């Protein structure tokens, strides 16, 4: 399946053009973060070897690690049963969270 065919499987309509992308560590399976992807950021992710997201606050694409050097190298991408969420397993270089923590999910509620 080519990249366009892979993108067309996904239902972007439910999220107003965005889908949630759960990022997990490839080896430990720890959830590192949740980001949102547009068709364009997903295409860039599928074309390369690092993750791209759509920033809802800045309203633009961003490559995770482009500023910090904490890139997420893609190992595997899976889609959920409703075709509206993806799970990306990565080899995380450095911290995934902007706070410097390995995971964005480090606080108890």
Swiss-Prot record:
- Protein name (Swiss-Prot/TrEMBL): Phosphoribosyl-AMP cyclohydrolase
Q: Where in the cell is it found?
A: Cytoplasm
| Binding partners and assembly | Homodimer.
Organism of origin: Clostridium botulinum (strain Alaska E43 / Type E3)
Give an example GO molecular function.
magnesium ion binding
Give the first-level EC class, as a single word. Answer: hydrolase
Keyword check for Cytoplasm: yes
- Write down the Gene3D superfamilies for this protein, in alphabetical order: Phosphoribosyl-AMP cyclohydrolase
InterPro entries annotated for this entry? PRA-CH, PRib_AMP_CycHydrolase_dom, PRib_AMP_CycHydrolase_sf
The UniProt family comment states: Belongs to the PRA-CH family.
Q: Which residues bind Mg(2+)?
A: 80, 82, 84
- What is the primary gene name for this protein? hisI
Enzyme Commission (EC) number: 3.5.4.19
Lineage at the top is: Bacteria, Bacillati, Bacillota, Clostridia, Eubacteriales
């Amino acid at each position: 399946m080519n990249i366009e065919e892979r993108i067309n499987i996904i239902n972007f309509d439910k999220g107003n053009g965005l889908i949630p992308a759960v990022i997990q560590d490839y080896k430990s399976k720890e959830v590192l973060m949740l980001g949102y992807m547009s068709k364009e950021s997903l295409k860039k992710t599928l074309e390369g070897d690092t993750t791209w997201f759509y920033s809802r606050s800045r309203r633009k694409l961003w490559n995770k690690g482009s500023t910090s050097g904490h890139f997420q190298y893609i190992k595997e991408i899976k889609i959920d049963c409703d075709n509206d969420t993806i799970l990306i397993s990565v080899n995380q270089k450095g911290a995934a969270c902007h706070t410097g923590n390995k995971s964005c999910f480090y606080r108890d509620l």
